[in-house]
Amino acid sequence: MKLINDILKKNYRLGKLLDIEEILTGYCNQSFTVWMEKNKFISKFLVRRYRLGTAEQEIKFEHALIYHLRKSEFKLTPDLIPQTNGNSYVKIQELDKGKPVVRFWAIFEFVEGENRYTWMDTDLSDAEITSAGQVLSRLHCAAQNFLIPPGSGRLQPKIMDFLPTFQLPYSKFTNRAGKTKCGRLFLKNMDNILAIIRKTIISKSDLIKMPFLPIHGDYHQGNLKYKKGRVVGVLDFDWAKIDFRLFDIALAVIYFSANWEKKRAGSLDRDKFETFIGSYNTACRLAESPGHLTSMEKKFFPSMLAAANLFVLHWAIVNFFTAVNPNDDEYLEYFDHNLKLMYWVENHQRLLADWIGL
């Protein structure tokens, strides 16, 4: 790709470009593996082209958090490769449908390890789930005391402020929803989705008692690299933000313990749930702060789990209705899964409280 070669030549001193391979597993950004030769030594890097519309302040936040994590001895996130001028990203003008647009690019070190799963794959080994829980705990511990640089930050609100905003885009989607299988399923369930959103409330007086810190925001098995049953890399911090720790944990539980198999689809697997939470808590006990799950976090875990699933469902809904020619069958699987899970979580609040140890 000529554009990548031009960016590398103009802004970096990484040597001669030998090969480029696009990574096709992402949904938002475009990523490439590149092989560079310098002084007869061949190195691999990851090149990211941020999705159109990404705000510069969000990239500044993401990169500052990555630097903080690595300085705090969390080395599982790949380091950023600075330009010759020291900046961590490249800002250029490209053409989109004939119109000039601003796009951002960044280069990361390449993390070796296995890409074993997508976010839909939950057949992880106990060792892999245990390691994932431990690593998320280490990430939260390292993320503390992060100072947000001026002019940086995630535009998306905190999860409990974000949920009430879902109604506005949903009302806009109804006019064209009946033309597709996804649209018809959305219309059939929209009132129930909005009703459950209204029920999923945690008061501010309770929220302020919970740990509030930088979170990954998209911690799933597809964003991790593995080696011999251990997590050896944590990728894709572009959804990171400052939010309640409990949301990050609940979101991870939705990903790591959800059942996708037909007979049990749309439910959570208790063994995987307890393995992940148990390993997270055990790892947290080794650090003074933020510590293991508090009694307040346990009390509202079922509610935050509902919020986390609604968050994932919302991503699928918005992506489907705003994409150009989305794959109806692909998104139907996402819609169906998270809708079933929405109802399962709603109907098993007492059971979930038992699982979390209330």
Annotate each PLM feature.
Residues 119-185, 212:
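A cross-family kinase active-site recognition segment
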Residues 27-37, 41-43, 80, 198-247:
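Active-site acidic catalytic loop and adjacent metal/ATP-binding pocket
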Residues 246-288, 306-324:
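Active-site activation/catalytic loop segments of kinase-like enzymes and analogous catalytic loops
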Residues 86, 107-121, 171-176, 310-326:
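A glycine-centered beta->alpha junction motif in the catalytic cores
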Residues 40-148:
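ATP-binding pocket architecture of kinase catalytic cores
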Residues 311-358:
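ATP/Mg2+ or Mg2+-diphosphate-binding catalytic cores
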Residues 1-85, 228-230, 356-358:
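Conserved NTP-binding catalytic cores of kinases and kinase-like/nucleotidyltransferase enzymes
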Residues 3-12, 148, 169-217:
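An alpha-helical support segment within catalytic cores of ATP-dependent transferases
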